[in-house]
Amino acid sequence: MSIKHSDVSIQYGYATVALGQMHYAQAGAADAPPLILMHAAGRSSSCYRHMLPLLAKDFRAIAIDLPGFGYSARMAANPTIDSLAHTLAELIDTLALQRPHIFGLHTGNKIAAALAANYPQRVGDVILAGQTHSLILDMKVRNAALAPYSDKYFPKYAHSSDGSHFLKAWNITQAAVEGFWWPSELLNAQGTRAEDLAQAEVRVIDHLHGWESIVPLYRAIFEFDLPEVVKRIQARTLVLELVTQQEAHYGPQGKLLCDLIPGAEHEQLQNAVGLSMEYRPDEIVTAIRRFLCRV
């Protein structure tokens, strides 16, 4: 299936891996350099819907739904970042991609790092992108910085014989959906745009598709040894730090991450937000193109 967007056709498909079928959206010529894009926890390939047409000029851009999210197969029990990286290596083989470039956002940057470290012959260049909190090297500090984003999803109750814990989990999901249904962009706007409603709709759908996988994925992130993994990356690497005023107290973290990867480069996007892929796609694409297309 394909949908026309800005005169560029976005195609949708599935690739079979051991877990089942992985869903993806792609744009660009089949013989263009492949570029895989991985999303954050709770999202799907839809977060790259504005970037794909822009990337299609230079790449075969492939935005995937991670296991348990979007339209991909369910996540395996007790996943690890390494196991998810293995699934991505399988997808690369299934699609017969030759050393695709890898772009990972937030959770995606952890999987991208593990993929590059564990399967160096499978990948081309690597871009690790995320807000400052997601690039912190110290595991305890990073996990504490993740708490404002993750705590609301973790249950504060025990399993019960009557199944009431399922209702409590569903109630947490409903509360999260309420926030995505009425984001600040809608509540505080002077005027409402069709794109604001479309953005809210995408966030709601993404959450409903992936709500059961968010906690297992965060647990995998909490256990992930980022410094150990990035030290093994051999690929040419860019760390793209999305700098926000709310996280200024952490100080720049991307350069510290770069120091562990031989030859890695650091770039910052100032005044960023978590939805920069959707609200400022041209700037993200410019950074990607500047790094990957450099001769």
Description of each model-found segment:
Residues 1-35, 57-59, 93, 97, ...:
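Alpha/beta-hydrolase fold catalytic core
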Residues 18-74:
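Conserved HGGG/HGGXW glycine-rich cap/lid loop of the alpha/beta-hydrolase fold
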Residues 62-107, 118, 277-278, 286:
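Active-site loop/oxyanion-hole signature of alpha/beta-hydrolase fold enzymes
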Residues 111-115:
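Hydrolases whose catalytic domains are alpha/beta-hydrolase-1, hotdog thioesterase
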Residues 117, 124-168:
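Flexible "cap/lid" loop of the alpha/beta hydrolase fold
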Residues 137, 160-232:
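Conserved alpha/beta-hydrolase catalytic His-Asp/Glu region
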Residues 234-272:
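Conserved loop-alpha-helix segment in the C-terminal half of the alpha/beta-hydrolase fold
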Residues 262-295:
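Catalytic active-site module of serine/aspartate enzymes centered on a nucleophile-bearing elbow/loop
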